Structure formats: structure tokens, C-alpha cells
Amino acid sequence: MAVPARRTSKAKKNKRRTHKGLTTPGLSRDSETGEYRMSHRISPDGTYKGRTIIEK
């Protein structure tokens, strides 16, 4: 089996893992209720972009 000739440094290891970081969710303030919610999602009262999508 192959064995690494040199030990991988912390910097090299961390540079390789930069893509594994967490990202913040896309939150936006709802214009009607003023609450934060996920972008491109229907609000709890069934409206999206000012239109009623789901009748309650």
C-alpha cells in the first residue's frame, strides 16, 4: 500500500476543506407580517408575492 512521504500540514488540510463550511439560509423580511422567512417560499397565511396561493 502507498504511504504518504510527508505529513499533511494543518494549512494544506484546511485549504482542502474550505468548501465544507456552512452557509446562512436566505432569509427575507415578509412585507405583510414583518417576520423573517425563507426566500421563494409561501408564507404561513398562504400568500406569495402578494397573491393568495392557498385558500384557508
UniProtKB/Swiss-Prot annotation:
GO CC annotations, alphabetized: cytosolic large ribosomal subunit
Regions of compositional bias (Basic residues) in chain numbering: 7-20
Transcription as UniProt keyword: no
Domain of life where this protein originates: Bacteria
Biological processes, Gene Ontology terms: translation
Residue stretches of biased makeup (Basic and acidic residues): 29-38
Keyword terms: Ribonucleoprotein, Ribosomal protein
Alphabetical list of SUPFAM superfamilies matching this protein: Zn-binding ribosomal proteins
UniProt KW Cell cycle keyword: no
Region (Disordered): 1-56
One term of GO molecular function: structural constituent of ribosome
Record-annotated disulphide pairs: none
Protein family membership: Belongs to the bacterial ribosomal protein bL32 family.
HAMAP family from the UniProt entry: Ribosomal_bL32
The name this protein goes by in its record: Large ribosomal subunit protein bL32A
Taxonomic source organism: Listeria monocytogenes serovar 1/2a (strain ATCC BAA-679 / EGD-e)
